[in-house]
Amino acid sequence: MTPSVNTADTDLHTTVFVLVHGAWHGSSQWAATQRALAGLGAASVAVDLPGHGFDAPVPSGYLLPGRPGLLTERSQLADVTMDDCADAVLDTLRRVRRYGRVVLVAHSAGGGPASLAAERAPELVDRLVYLSAFVPAGRARFFDYLGAPENSTAWGQGLSLGDPQALGAVRIDPLSPDPVYVEELRQTHYHDTPADRFDRWRSALSPDLPLAVPATPVILTAGRWGRIPRTFLRCAEDRALPTAVQNLMIAEADRAMPGEPFTVRTLPGSHSPFAARPRELAEALVG
């Protein structure tokens, strides 16, 4: 049986799932999951965080032969803040609240903006779902968990390009012509997605994650974020954010905010179930 988020206390047809992507992704990567949700009778809307999706700016040499400046050109997203990202989530939450119950779902680095949005307006969220996502309740910055010993087995150490501080972004090269780099990207984030399909997924990624997303502290309180029921969907074979660090975030959040401890479920597979098993993911979300 597919693990599920508890929606037994409500009519699914009055629930809206708000989906927040992670680093380098966009709303379009949720499309297969949204189709599966619709088939199950659930409404959903996917958010594009600032600097992501089809409007994402790219370095000037990104599509040119030799990729001039890719390692050094400062990102156009360098001035994007965590507040900007949370505002994008809040705007969507406010627009859908009138339709009924709202479940806010965050993947990976999207956990920071989603958490801050929930902290600012807990009345707009009925349940939080973290899909192998950053939970700032125990440690305020995503970098604090990425640098933890529990994350030492993570893959993808060779993916980041240049100096993030100088670039103002964590930059990768989804369109790299280097097959070794491309395979590292696939093995890190999409290892259970067939290689021929992965080329389509990587072509939709954008190169820059605003540095503010992993570097900005997100301060949560028990009276606001901590009062919202929450679920963590672990990805069992996650190579980008190993289960050890997922478990660390869960444990530290529950110690810091014990009033609404996590309901924990486990999905099989990689960091990106929206690519490899969208129907299973949808079933886990709706219950």
Predicted features, each with a name:
Residues G100-D144:
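Conserved hydrolase catalytic core segment
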Residues L49-V103, E119, Y145-G147:
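Active-site loop/oxyanion-hole signature of alpha/beta-hydrolase fold enzymes
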